[in-house]
């Protein structure tokens, strides 16, 4: 549960092989990439992405409360997330915390839309019939802003 609350994905079900960039899953913010050390596989690509700002999506931690939701719903319907009726991302993983009946998970959000998100905004989804909230861990703050 803490892994989802802190937005730390693992495994091939949460991280798409050959398509997910290290910066999308916040490895740069967690100290998983060195931009001082050279000569490692992918070093030039990672540096170019970081310094040119080419990341288009970011993983963020989400949560929502819905007693009627079951995880099997996610496989049967669209897992898209909306902000003001605009598709801005998708749910990657979910897990129920039985202590407080809250679903915690990770979503992939378009970075171009993330700057529009404010604390009082709630994201919408079709599969859970609930408002999704994002609680950014301290390592993700301040939020990226539109350039």
Indicate residue ranges for each PLM-predicted region.
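Glycine-rich, small/acidic residue-mixed loop/short-helix segments
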Residues: 30-31, 48-147
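Anionic-ligand-binding alpha/beta catalytic cores of soluble enzymes and soluble regulatory domains
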Residues: 2-64
